[in-house]
């Protein structure tokens, strides 16, 4: 006769207490990825675990309006609103990409009241790696 396996509480039950509202985060990293089509803002703690994120698409902008500076500003404000409530005071900012929303997102981050320790441009630059796609003829 097979023994009954004792039920161990599921992982989901253990995670509920440490969910978004419970953690206090004094310092974090704000990643801004600005492409020509969209801007994605991700807020992580210093270990790299995602705390909050937002993009121009999730902020209600669709189509070509996602690439605008105003959409990037709105996305940054939405991502930061939750972490300010969790007690974040200082942050590092990493900006990646050539998009129009770079400066607008940084302006929204500065306006949020979080003290910025540094702002770094982490756009990947090839040392003449892969051949780029052919130029568009419109």
Swiss-Prot record:
Keywords: Chloroplast, Plastid, Ribonucleoprotein, Ribosomal protein, RNA-binding, rRNA-binding. GO terms for cellular component: chloroplast; ribonucleoprotein complex; ribosome. The keyword Chloroplast applies. The keyword Ribosomal protein applies. GO terms for biological process: translation. It is found in: Plastid, Chloroplast. It comes from the Eukaryota. Residues 1-22 are annotated as: Disordered. GO terms for molecular function: rRNA binding; structural constituent of ribosome. InterPro entries: Ribosomal_uS11, Ribosomal_uS11_bac-type, Ribosomal_uS11_CS, Ribosomal_uS11_sf. Residues 9-22 have a biased composition (Basic residues). Belongs to the universal ribosomal protein uS11 family. Part of the 30S ribosomal subunit. This is Small ribosomal subunit protein uS11c.
């Amino acid at each position: 006769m097979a023994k009954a396996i004792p039920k161990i509480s599921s992982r989901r039950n253990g995670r509920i207490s440490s969910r978004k509202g419970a953690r206090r985060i004094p310092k974090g990293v704000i990643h801004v990825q600005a492409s020509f089509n969209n801007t994605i803002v991700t807020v992580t703690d210093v270990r790299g675990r995602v705390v909050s994120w937002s993009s121009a698409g999730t902020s209600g902008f669709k189509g070509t309006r996602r690439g605008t500076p105003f959409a990037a500003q709105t996305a940054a404000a939405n991502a930061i609103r939750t972490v300010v409530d969790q007690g974040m005071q200082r942050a590092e900012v990493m900006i990646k990409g050539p998009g129009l929303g770079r400066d607008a997102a940084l302006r929204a981050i500065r306006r949020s009241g979080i003290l910025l320790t540094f702002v770094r441009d982490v756009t990947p630059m090839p040392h003449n790696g892969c051949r780029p796609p052919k130029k568009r003829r419109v």
